[in-house]
């Protein structure tokens, strides 16, 4: 394996572990709000909360990113990047657009 590939995989694992640890912490602090912010179903949130540190590390070792870029809708991405509405109104609009997205389920 090339050094660049190895470095990229190490970076993916690091991002995955950081994401999983952050998600667990968020869920512990405010379960309902975190499910909304993360786009998790109740089942996914429950599974993630029950994972041990060793299981988190194993899951993070995937060669694929575990987090997903949720801003794949042009109107949502535009709402977050263009200062058309300004400040709080723009943030509220983005939150409404995010709330319309379906919750992710395990396939």
Swiss-Prot record:
One Gene Ontology term of the biological-process aspect is: regulation of bacterial-type flagellum assembly
Q: Which domain of life is it from?
A: Bacteria
Keywords for the protein's UniProt record, in alphabetical order: Activator, Bacterial flagellum biogenesis, Cytoplasm, Disulfide bond, DNA-binding, Transcription, Transcription regulation
Molecular function in Gene Ontology: DNA binding
Where's it mainly located?
cytoplasm
Q: Which InterPro entries match?
A: Flagellar_FlhD (IPR023559), FlhD_sf (IPR036194)
Where is it localised? Answer: Cytoplasm
Which Gene Ontology cellular component annotation is one that this UniProt entry carries?
cytoplasm
**Record note on quaternary structure:** Homodimer; disulfide-linked. Forms a heterohexamer composed of two FlhC and four FlhD subunits. Each FlhC binds a FlhD dimer, forming a heterotrimer, and a hexamer assembles by dimerization of two heterotrimers.
Please state what the annotation says regarding this protein's domains: The C-terminal region contains a putative helix-turn-helix (HTH) motif, suggesting that this region may bind DNA.
What role does this protein play? Functions in complex with FlhC as a master transcriptional regulator that regulates transcription of several flagellar and non-flagellar operons by binding to their promoter region. Activates expression of class 2 flagellar genes, including fliA, which is a flagellum-specific sigma factor that turns on the class 3 genes. Also regulates genes whose products function in a variety of physiological pathways.
Please give the family membership noted in the entry. Belongs to the FlhD family.
Name by which UniProt lists this protein? Flagellar transcriptional regulator FlhD
The organism encoding this protein is Bordetella bronchiseptica (strain ATCC BAA-588 / NCTC 13252 / RB50) (Alcaligenes bronchisepticus)
């Amino acid at each position: 394996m090339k050094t660049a590939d190895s470095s990229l995989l190490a970076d993916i694992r690091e991002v995955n572990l950081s994401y999983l640890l952050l998600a667990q912490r968020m869920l512990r602090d405010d379960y309902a709000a975190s499910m909304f912010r993360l786009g998790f179903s109740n089942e996914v949130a429950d599974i993630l909360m029950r994972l041990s540190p060793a299981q988190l590390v194993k899951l993070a070792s995937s060669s694929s990113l575990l987090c997903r870029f949720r801003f794949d809708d042009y109107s949502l991405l535009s709402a977050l990047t263009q200062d058309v509405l300004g400040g709080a109104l723009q943030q509220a609009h983005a939150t409404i657009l995010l709330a319309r997205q379906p919750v992710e389920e395990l396939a």
